[in-house]
C-alpha cells in the first residue's frame, strides 16, 4: 500500500492514495522532512534568473476575482455562469481538470490523467466547449486546472479511462511510452532534495520527463487544444514538481505564450523550491496567505494588516481562504465547516487590496477522499444549489456576492481610515470608494465609523437586507455590526444585493421588539437553518424591525428571534411558522398585517 503525506510542504492536488501517513504529515507540518532514501542525482539544478512580470489579467468592470467550482460538471458551470456568476460580477471560473482520467468515484481520480482527450467524469468535449462559450457570453472567463506533471500512478496497472482509452503502467497509446518518464522510479521521500522533488514519483504517479522536447510538445498540444476552445487561462497543478525552466519552455510553445498561468507551488521555509522562482511563466498561489488568515480569524484580527508580510508581491499572488486540497488535508486553513468565521475570512480577502482572490465552492464531506455523493466511476451528478446537504454554493451567499461587487467598485484604491479595537473588531476604507467593518467577536458592536466616503445614503452590500446607512458631511456613520458579522458600503451601492438564490415566493417579516439588535434565525421549507444567530433585521417603524425572506419555491419559513447576546424568542420552544407576503410577529402571535403605514 502507498502512503499519502498530506502536508503543507509536499502535497499538490494529485497526491491521493488510500493510506494516510499521519506521523509524516505531522512532522512536515512542523517544517521537518521525512527521512531520505538515497537517490542518485545529477549536477545541482540552477535557479532561473530574475523572472519577467506577468500580472493577473483584469477584466474591465469585473476586476480579477475568480470562483473555483470544484467538481462541478461543465453543464452545471454553464448554467451557473448565466444565473449567478456573471450577474454577481466574477471575472473567472476555475474548473476541475478536463482531461480523461482513471475511473473511480473519489475526487482525486480527476488528477490522474490517462490521455489528453476532453472526456472526463465532469463532461464531454462538446459540453466543455458549450460551457466556455456560455460563460464568455455572461462575461466570465474559464481557467482550466492543468495536470501536466504526471500521468496516473504506476500502482494503477492497466485499465480504461473515463473516455474509454486503454492505458498501461508506463504506456499511454498515442501519447507517452516508457521513455517519456523520468529515470527515478522511486517515490519522493525528502522535500529538501530538489532532484527528488522534481524527478521522482509523487506517491507512485508516473513523473513526466518535462525536460524532453517530445514531452513538452505533447503537453503544449494539450494546452493549445484548450486555448482553441476559448479557455482564458490555466491553474498549473503541481508546478513545484516541474523545473521552472521546463514550464517556461512549454509555455513558449503555446499559440498564446502570454496566456495567464497561476502555479500551485506549496512553499515552506527551508525548502529549496519556492513560489518566487516560478514567476517567470505566471503568478503563483500564495498558500501562506491562507494559513495566516486562519491564524488571525482563530485569534485576534487587530493585527491582520500584517497578513502579507514576507509574501509574494501583490500583483503576482493568487490568494484564497481555502481550496480543494487545503480544506481536506490539514494544511492550516479554514473551510466551510468554520461557518460565519469562514465567511468573514472571505469578506476580508475580497475587501483587502492584496493579490487576486479566488472564492472556493465545493461540496460537503466527512471522508476526505469521497467524491460528490451520487458519483459513479465515470460520471459526477450535476450540481444543485437547492441541495444544501451536498453543495456549499458559496457564490450564492449574500456575503460573497456583495463583496465581489464591493471589490469591483473599489478597484485601484488603497487602504485608508484603518481602525481596530485591539482585538476582534476592525474597519477600513478603500479610498473614497468604499468602507468595510468586520466583527470577529461573539457580541454585536455599535459605534460611529470615520470614512472617506462622500456624504450620502448607502446600502450595506454584505447583509443583503437592504439596510441603509447615512454618511454625513464629515464622512461618519453609525451602525450596529452583529456578532461574527460584517458591513460594507461602496459608492454606487444604492440597490441591495439579491439575498441568495432567486425565488418566486417572498415574505416580509415584521418583529416587535425593544432589543437594540435583532436577528432572525430561520430555515426555508425543510432546508438547512441559517448559522446562528442568523441574519440581522433592520428598523421598520416604531417598535418593529423587519427583513425580507426569499422562500424560493417553498411557501413557509420556520424561525426564532434573538438579540445576538444569548436572549432568544423561540415561541416557547415551538418556533414560529411564517408564510404569506407579510408575517407580523407580536407577543408570540403571527398575523398577516403590516404594522407600518
PLM region spans:
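Structural beta-strand segments of beta-rich domains
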Residues: 505-509
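Aromatic- and acidic-residue-enriched carbohydrate-binding clefts of CAZyme catalytic domains
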Residues: 61-64, 101-133, 166-209
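Low-complexity, acidic Ser/Thr/Pro-rich repeat tracts that form intrinsically disordered stalk/linker regions
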Residues: 40-59
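Secretory targeting and sorting signals
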Residues: 1-44
Amino acid at each position: 500500500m502507498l502512503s499519502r503525506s498530506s502536508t503543507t510542504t509536499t502535497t499538490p492536488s494529485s497526491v491521493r492514495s488510500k493510506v494516510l501517513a499521519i506521523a509524516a504529515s505531522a512532522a512536515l507540518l512542523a517544517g521537518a522532512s521525512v527521512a531520505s532514501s538515497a537517490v542518485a542525482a545529477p549536477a545541482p539544478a540552477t535557479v532561473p534568473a530574475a523572472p519577467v512580470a506577468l500580472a493577473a489579467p483584469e477584466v474591465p468592470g469585473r476586476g480579477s476575482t475568480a470562483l473555483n467550482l470544484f467538481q462541478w460538471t461543465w453543464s452545471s458551470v454553464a448554467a451557473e455562469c448565466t444565473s449567478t456568476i456573471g450577474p454577481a460580477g466574477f471575472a473567472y471560473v476555475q474548473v476541475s481538470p478536463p482531461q480523461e482520467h482513471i475511473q473511480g468515484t473519489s475526487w482525486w481520480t480527476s488528477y490522474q490523467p490517462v490521455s489528453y482527450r476532453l472526456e472526463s467524469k465532469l463532461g464531454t468535449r462538446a459540453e466543455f466547449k458549450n460551457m466556455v462559450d456560455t460563460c464568455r457570453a455572461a462575461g466570465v472567463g474559464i481557467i482550466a486546472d492543468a495536470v501536466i506533471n504526471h500521468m496516473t500512478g504506476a500502482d494503477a496497472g492497466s485499465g480504461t479511462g473515463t473516455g474509454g482509452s486503454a492505458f498501461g503502467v508506463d504506456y499511454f497509446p498515442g501519447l507517452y511510452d516508457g521513455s517519456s518518464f523520468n529515470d527515478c522510479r522511486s517515490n519522493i521521500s525528502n522535500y529538501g532534495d530538489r532532484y527528488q522533488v522534481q524527478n521522482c514519483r509523487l506517491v507512485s504517479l508516473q513523473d513526466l520527463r518535462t525536460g524532453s522536447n517530445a514531452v513538452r510538445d505533447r503537453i503544449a498540444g494539450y494546452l493549445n487544444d484548450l486555448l482553441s476552445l476559448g479557455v482564458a487561462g490555466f491553474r498549473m497543478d503541481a508546478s513545484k514538481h516541474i523545473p521552472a525552466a521546463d514550464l517556461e519552455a512549454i509555455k513558449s510553445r503555446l499559440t498564446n505564450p502570454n496566456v495567464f498561468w497561476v502555479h500551485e507551488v506549496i512553499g515552506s521555509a527551508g525548502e529549496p523550491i519556492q513560489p518566487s522562482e516560478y514567476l517567470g511563466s505566471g503568478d503563483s498561489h500564495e498558500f501562506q496567505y491562507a494559513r495566516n488568515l486562519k491564524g488571525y480569524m482563530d485569534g485576534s484580527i487587530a493585527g491582520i494588516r500584517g497578513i502579507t508580510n514576507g509574501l509574494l508581491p501583490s500583483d503576482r499572488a493568487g490568494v484564497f481562504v481555502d481550496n480543494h486540497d487545503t480544506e481536506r488535508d490539514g494544511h492550516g486553513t479554514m473551510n466551510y465547516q468554520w461557518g460565519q468565521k469562514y465567511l468573514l475570512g472571505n469578506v476580508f480577502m475580497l475587501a483587502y487590496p492584496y493579490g487576486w482572490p479566488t472564492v472556493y465552492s465545493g461540496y460537503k464531506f466527512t471522508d476526505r477522499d469521497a467524491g460528490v455523493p451520487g458519483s459513479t466511476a465515470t460520471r459526477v451528478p450535476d450540481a444543485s444549489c437547492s441541495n444544501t446537504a451536498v453543495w456549499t454554493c458559496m457564490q450564492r451567499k449574500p456575503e460573497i456576492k456583495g463583496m465581489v461587487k464591493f471589490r469591483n467598485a473599489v478597484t485601484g484604491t488603497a487602504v485608508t481610515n484603518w481602525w481596530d479595537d485591539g482585538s476582534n473588531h476592525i474597519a477600513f476604507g478603500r479610498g473614497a470608494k468604499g468602507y468595510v467593518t468586520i466583527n470577529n467577536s461573539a457580541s454585536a458592536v455599535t459605534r460611529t465609523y470615520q470614512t472617506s466616503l462622500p456624504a450620502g445614503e448607502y446600502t450595506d452590500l454584505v447583509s443583503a437586507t437592504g439596510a441603509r446607512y447615512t454618511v454625513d458631511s464629515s464622512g461618519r456613520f453609525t451602525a450596529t455590526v452583529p456578532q461574527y458579522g460584517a458591513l460594507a458600503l461602496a459608492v454606487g451601492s444604492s440597490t441591495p444585493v439579491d439575498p441568495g438564490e432567486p425565488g418566486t415566493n417572498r415574505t416580509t417579516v415584521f418583529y416587535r421588539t425593544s432589543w437594540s439588535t435583532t436577528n432572525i434565525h430561520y430555515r426555508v421549507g425543510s432546508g438547512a437553518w441559517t448559522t446562528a444567530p442568523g441574519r440581522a433585521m433592520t428598523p421598520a417603524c416604531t417598535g418593529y424591525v423587519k427583513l425580507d425572506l426569499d422562500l424560493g419555491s417553498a411557501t413557509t419559513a420556520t424561525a426564532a428571534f434573538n438579540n445576538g447576546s444569548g436572549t432568544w424568542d423561540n415561541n416557547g420552544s415551538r418556533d414560529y411558522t411564517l408564510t404569506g407576503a407579510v408575517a407580523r410577529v407580536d407577543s408570540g402571535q403571527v398575523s398577516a398585517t403590516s404594522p407600518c403605514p
